[in-house]
């Protein structure tokens, strides 16, 4: 192996025969040896083909030649293995075909240009008559059998993208560096059997100036304004996209395919040679595809070639304008859009165009140019890239990243810290880093836009997936289903005939046809059960070709079941069935899951701690045999996280691990390293320390949920003893709750370390009869790591310890000292007492001021300043804590630095859309809009500045609108109350036209009928009292109760005077001013005659005096400002009588202790009558009334009111 220096230059032999027109002809012969002078450090190697174990098979490498090699025999033809030794390392490559790089039907087109002198450099007119034209010279399928991807055997995190079309060529990404490999000479496939020399060089060793990518993209669509005339060309395509759905096969979830048109100009073809350029480009795109498969991206994207076009000389120079990258990109995008297949389902329809050239289209160092977020756009989904070897794959990936929506790291995002580590979207590509990756910002920006790129959802590859029948039993007879259920030979039982063979499937074996078996299940739906019939839902039914599909729908949830554990966090479930309705005839099943779960019994177990997983393993001790022997089974945590919810146990006797062929019980902890996440139906469910599903809360070092270690204390010490006799010798105790426990010997000794559970007496480590050997085991619900190295023992566990443990030694020699050092972390409330055993409490954590961040720049442009922000950091774990932990007088002074030094742009007036008009007509309508003075920034955003910085007049922000006369409208008042108290009546309202007789439409009605409850039609059986004939009482006929009592007398009177005392019901019972004991007994109405309802609150009334029938001591209640004339009283009494909320009482003018008496003897007699008629107790001097649960004693003085006499 020879390490060549920078000065070693390989000879380059080029022989080109050109045609008369200056172009390369068909007979062109090109041999180009690699320009290895560009590489500062490289090695010449001879790769070999090997098998999986790395054993030599042959020197044959190329795909076209491997078929002829008799020695190239592999047990798996889908894999290839090669050995390469370079830079002191052995690379055992494991490769598989990259079947996702070239789409089916992909082609290579060779374009030829016919020229008219003088016009070949005009990139705009090259399609005019008499100018340059081109035609397809030939088309051939794009070869797909020599692109491979893979990794390096036994080295995790590596990737390889290599082609073996002509030797090995491509990229090897190891654990700490990236290498390129390619054959030293091309076209030597037939000479490989003797060994073929290749060049391997580091990517960081490619000699080139730093590549400035800071100006390699367009921000806005207007930057490609020269393509506006393509709007007409692609109008039909947009219409087709909107009116029809693409019928291409849909890719899987989170799987995206960029179907690429690869355009290659003549400069690239000439440099690599027509015979080799296709293989080179295939290798280059294989590397690009692998870059997009890096797991740091977070999204799986395939770069798929659907078409490759090799351009002729004239077309190539017409597209690229030297020194004008914007115009060159415009020409390339125009050309790519013109190559698009109009049929969306065409196999060559592309999503994105990549153009490669070796011409200088921009200033020195510019390697690419692309628009941002142009993916899937018919014009803007394209990139212009300078091809310069395999390292150009990173330029292509970088520019395509812009089209996908990614921006430069550190420009407009906070990922500038990742550029020095080799991020793909770094603005300055120096090729001096070791491993590429996608920054976190690139992943976030991609995920922000990727879901809007519908064109990437197509799957260009054919999949031979069989179409499943709508009913599963169509393809399987009952005999076949019997064979599946019970084994070879079983068929449907014919010993007895069932009424319906679809109820249950019975099977028997020909050796014993009368012995029938069943699994108590029906045959599959669709199983033929008779001629023209099939089984469906347990019934033999006639086949109906026109059966309509019925999608399923979920039924209701059941109640939650019992908890899987009585303590220590269990799980309970509830379920639902897809039966509302059930899916039939191929209908869709119900979406979503059929069960839900929640945590239950999350409190810790009160009794002695027991490991739930260990209990499940112990239950197998009595009946589970492994290798024909019973074992004592201990819990075992599988290293594969996907299998930690499967029950694996470890034999205490042999150490063998056995799978118990079942899942762990729901509520079992997934891992001993995570005390909260649990297994639910075989899946690990993340649970935080707050015992909430999906929570990210974690414990600090001493078990405080969401803590910051401020309550944690570290206890450490050294204990030395010299044994005088054999037998276990106690050294010290470790209390429960201890975490991060470390016990180790200070020096080699013959003694053996042992651990004992103080609560149970069980030996955790090195009990009697056990062999002391290094191992990792589980006990006391935690994982222990016991290690013996050079006769020095150590024991570690993360804990926490659920029980106290005793640390002992097993002496092997007398009078030999044993010295143990221990250290653990515990909560400050559980710190043990410090004694003379040399146990000390470690000092509290120390803190320091550390740079936290930089402040926001004082100016967005034109040169501003930003200052350092310091925070308080704990030294033990470098975690930022509250600033109060650090000494304020030691805080460093802020450091200032310049920022945003780019020149500011001129602010502009920006007016937003007008708001809606405030009126639809009239003379006062106006509308507003927001007008701001904005300054465009270089990152594409704007900032608002003071209006004084904007030039020109400020656009108006308010203007009149809809200033037209409003049409005249009819105005209507409220409807009056019904004219009657029962039966049919009328309501009236006022209708006016403010514009005379010029109102639009018909005049609204001013009178309408009203319907009240039917009047009382009970037959009148005559007056029930002789007092009914008294004229002085005739005014009470309007009261329903009195009218019923004196129906004969009231019916004889044509008109009835209003009652002298009225009071509408108040909003609360206390608003009714009443005291039956203070009223004339002749005027107290029986409550039973006047129903009281609380359904409709009535309006309050004020009291005023009135001189009318009833005497000077009579009072009536009226609405404020109402007229107390007889008509009003008559109308009010009628309304009061028909109201459901009215209660009639009297209000005296004299103080409550006096009684008011009528002046006639007849009225005195009437008082006696009414008192006797109050069967419910209205004459009682103490009455109670219930309303809203309150008891009111009417003997107490009433609420004060203003009374006028």
UniProtKB/Swiss-Prot annotation:
Residues 256-460 form the Peptidase M12B domain. Residues 713-844 are annotated as: Spacer. Pfam families: ADAMTS_CR_2 (PF17771), ADAMTS_CR_3 (PF19236), ADAMTS_spacer1 (PF05986), Pep_M12B_propep (PF01562), Reprolysin (PF01421), TSP1_ADAMTS (PF19030), TSP_1 (PF00090). Disulfide bonds join 333-382, 376-455, 415-441, 482-507, 493-516, 502-535, 529-540, 563-600, 567-605, 578-590, 978-1010, 982-1015, 993-999. The keyword Disulfide bond applies. Residues 1-20 form the signal peptide. One of its GO terms (molecular function) is zinc ion binding. Residues 551-606, 845-905, 906-965, 966-1014 form the TSP type-1 domain. Its cofactor is Zn(2+). Its main location: secreted. Glycans are attached at residues 83, 119, 242, 345, 475, 814, 942. Residues 21-249 form a propeptide. Changing residue 291 to T: In HKLLS3; affects proteolytic maturation and impairs secretion. GO terms for cellular component: extracellular exosome; extracellular matrix; extracellular region; extracellular space. It is an enzyme of class 3 (hydrolase). Binds 1 zinc ion per subunit. Keywords: Cleavage on pair of basic residues, Disease variant, Disulfide bond, Extracellular matrix, Glycoprotein, Heparin-binding, Hydrolase, Metal-binding, Metalloprotease, Protease, Repeat, Secreted, Signal, Zinc, Zymogen. Its EC number is 3.4.24.-. Residues 1015-1054 form the PLAC domain. The precursor is cleaved by a furin endopeptidase. Residues 470-550 form the Disintegrin domain. It is linked to Hennekam lymphangiectasia-lymphedema syndrome 3: A form of Hennekam lymphangiectasia-lymphedema syndrome, a generalized lymph-vessels dysplasia characterized by intestinal lymphangiectasia with severe lymphedema of the limbs, genitalia and face. In addition, affected individuals have unusual facies and some manifest intellectual disability. HKLLS3 is characterized by widespread congenital edema, facial dysmorphism and protein-losing enteropathy of variable severity. HKLLS3 transmission pattern is consistent with autosomal recessive inheritance. Cleaves the propeptides of type II collagen prior to fibril assembly. Does not act on types I and III collagens. This is A disintegrin and metalloproteinase with thrombospondin motifs 3. It comes from Homo sapiens (Human).
